[in-house]
Curated annotation (Swiss-Prot):
Positions that bind a divalent metal cation: D9, E10, D104
Catalytic activity line of the entry: Endonucleolytic cleavage to 5'-phosphomonoester
Alphabetized InterPro entries for the sequence: RNase_H2_suA, RNase_HII/HIII, RNase_HII/HIII_dom, RNase_HII_arc, RNase_HII_hlx-loop-hlx_cap_dom, RNaseH-like_sf, RNaseH_sf
Protein name: Ribonuclease HII
Domain RNase H type-2 intervals: 3-198
One Pfam family from the record: RNase_HII
Gene3D superfamilies: Ribonuclease H-like superfamily/Ribonuclease H (3.30.420.10), Ribonuclease hii. Domain 2 (1.10.10.460)
Gene Ontology CC annotations of this record: cytoplasm; ribonuclease H2 complex
Length: 198
């Protein structure tokens, strides 16, 4: 039996509009690297879409969770945004078995975050900053970003163009002032209107 490695990453932690998506990819790092996976932010949307399909075909397991803004709010109101990632990452690890997981850590102390995941899941976890250098993490980054981008595109059809959804985007700020604000698509816990994000 081969040694299985997994990677976990997220997309959409910082926006005030839309969901956060956390993804796990378990697969051969060499195979994924040959596909050309890298940090999703460094790829064009078209390239991400192509890689997404290739990842689905090449990986042993791919899964993701969509965390809606209301759920993000329940964690942020209590100052527990990192705990949100911890909880959902643990659930994803249970869905895609591997011998070790490389996780892009939201915590300033990656060892603390990795230890917490190991305690919850009973699996070996290596948490790090800038984890996209690990092919499985880069692949998870791409999966999370593609899924989120698709959901955001659907949301824009429903509520209008709100820009990137990030607090620093002038179009997003303008939309928050004057746009249609369905309660379910906005993270009300963000301090964006006061000029900050959590």
């Amino acid at each position: 039996m081969s040694f299985l490695e997994g990677g976990v990453d997220e997309a959409g932690r910082g926006p005030v509009v839309g969901p956060m998506v956390i993804a796990v990819v378990v697969g051969d790092g060499g195979v994924l690297a040959r596909l050309g996976v890298r940090d999703s932010k460094r790829l064009s949307p078209e390239r991400r879409e192509r890689l997404y399909q290739l990842i689905l075909e090449a990986a042993d397991c791919v899964n993701y969770v969509v965390v809606e803004p209301a759920v993000v709010d329940t964690y942020v109101w209590r100052g527990l945004l990192n705990a949100l990632e911890l909880d959902y990452t643990a659930k994803l690890i249970e869905l895609c078995p591997a011998d070790v997981y490389y996780v892009d850590s939201p915590d300033v102390d990656p060892r603390r975050y990795g230890s917490a995941l190991e305690f919850i899941t009973g699996r070996r976890v290596v948490a790090m900053h800038k984890g996209e250098s690990v092919p499985q993490v880069a692949a998870a980054s791409i999966v999370a970003k593609v899924v989120r981008d698709r959901l955001v595109a659907l949301l824009k059809k429903e509520v209008g163009d709100f820009g990137s959804g990030y607090p620093s985007d002038p179009r997003t700020r303008e939309w928050l002032k004057w746009g249609r604000l369905p309660p379910e698509c906005v993270r009300w816990s963000w301090r964006t209107l006061r000029g900050e994000s959590p």
